[in-house]
Amino acid sequence: MYKLVLIRHGESTWNLDNRFTGWTDVDLTETGIAQAKNSGQLLKAEGYDFDLAYTSVLKRATRTLWHVLDEMDQTWLPVEHSWRLNERHYGDLQGLNKAETAKKFGDEQVLVWRRSYDTPPPPLAANDPRSERSDRRYANLLPGQVPLTECLKDTVERVLPFWNEAMAPAIKAGKRIVVAAHGNSIRALVKYLDNISDSDIVGLNIPNGIPLVYELDENLKPLRSYYLGDSEAAAKAAAAVGAQGKAVAA
């Protein structure tokens, strides 16, 4: 049996402000740092030990990973960064407050933009200063690989090659891996692993800073999955994520 540990980054400054973040490179809040440290403490207390770590190229995920590994006394661990693990790109919504956007366009439309499988938000203009196409960290990518918007389907299509070419072979080689990423890049992996339908994925929310453990068979098919720590607290945190895009907070 293999194990895979997935951690959504701790609370970011734009999570706190209830803004659409996407590829915008915002930092963790003090709460987010505490969540990341708590994840590391949970993993250490449960006897987890890793050989390899993966994260995105966005600081809220990379710093979450660092705090996790620091609490585990494993900051020396090899870490591979990949843009393919970045958050889903939210296009022209990036930087906007989710509740205010829902008041303007309606809860239903914002839910479609946030959680539907194949409907992207309105794109950024190519010359929009919020675009990442001139960012050095993406200099080796083809222009079309740096998105102006994405739906979850697009996110799945960029995450799965990294799973197939890097993560899955490492797991099968016996490497114990931890992944610190983002709500939608983790949703993409969970959709694939659990074979969740395009319609059912709408209801899946990933809470900040709580380790999600997958136990996998020899073919990397899930035997079971669970959040470490207080399962009721994890469920409440996931429900809170789902309520972020409503005009009136739930």
Curated annotation (Swiss-Prot):
<feature type="binding site">
    <location>
        <begin position="8"/>
        <end position="15"/>
    </location>
    <ligand>
        <name>substrate</name>
    </ligand>
</feature>
<keyword id="KW-0324">Glycolysis</keyword>
<feature type="region of interest" description="Disordered">
    <location>
        <begin position="116"/>
        <end position="135"/>
    </location>
</feature>
<feature type="binding site">
    <location>
        <position position="60"/>
    </location>
    <ligand>
        <name>substrate</name>
    </ligand>
</feature>
<comment type="subunit">
    <text>Homodimer.</text>
</comment>
<dbReference type="GO" id="GO:0006094">
    <property type="term" value="P:gluconeogenesis"/>
</dbReference>
<feature type="site" description="Transition state stabilizer">
    <location>
        <position position="182"/>
    </location>
</feature>
<dbReference type="GO" id="GO:0006096">
    <property type="term" value="P:glycolytic process"/>
</dbReference>
<keyword id="KW-0413">Isomerase</keyword>
<dbReference type="InterPro" id="IPR001345">
    <property type="entry name" value="PG/BPGM_mutase_AS"/>
</dbReference>
<dbReference type="GO" id="GO:0004619">
    <property type="term" value="F:phosphoglycerate mutase activity"/>
</dbReference>
<dbReference type="InterPro" id="IPR013078">
    <property type="entry name" value="His_Pase_superF_clade-1"/>
</dbReference>
<feature type="active site" description="Tele-phosphohistidine intermediate">
    <location>
        <position position="9"/>
    </location>
</feature>
<comment type="function">
    <text>Catalyzes the interconversion of 2-phosphoglycerate and 3-phosphoglycerate.</text>
</comment>
<comment type="pathway">
    <text>Carbohydrate degradation; glycolysis; pyruvate from D-glyceraldehyde 3-phosphate: step 3/5.</text>
</comment>
<dbReference type="InterPro" id="IPR005952">
    <property type="entry name" value="Phosphogly_mut1"/>
</dbReference>
<feature type="binding site">
    <location>
        <begin position="21"/>
        <end position="22"/>
    </location>
    <ligand>
        <name>substrate</name>
    </ligand>
</feature>
<feature type="binding site">
    <location>
        <begin position="114"/>
        <end position="115"/>
    </location>
    <ligand>
        <name>substrate</name>
    </ligand>
</feature>
<dbReference type="Pfam" id="PF00300">
    <property type="entry name" value="His_Phos_1"/>
</dbReference>
<feature type="active site" description="Proton donor/acceptor">
    <location>
        <position position="87"/>
    </location>
</feature>
<protein>
    <recommendedName>
        <fullName>2,3-bisphosphoglycerate-dependent phosphoglycerate mutase</fullName>
        <ecNumber>5.4.2.11</ecNumber>
    </recommendedName>
</protein>
<feature type="binding site">
    <location>
        <begin position="87"/>
        <end position="90"/>
    </location>
    <ligand>
        <name>substrate</name>
    </ligand>
</feature>
<feature type="binding site">
    <location>
        <position position="98"/>
    </location>
    <ligand>
        <name>substrate</name>
    </ligand>
</feature>
<dbReference type="InterPro" id="IPR029033">
    <property type="entry name" value="His_PPase_superfam"/>
</dbReference>
<keyword id="KW-0312">Gluconeogenesis</keyword>
<comment type="similarity">
    <text>Belongs to the phosphoglycerate mutase family. BPG-dependent PGAM subfamily.</text>
</comment>
<feature type="binding site">
    <location>
        <begin position="183"/>
        <end position="184"/>
    </location>
    <ligand>
        <name>substrate</name>
    </ligand>
</feature>
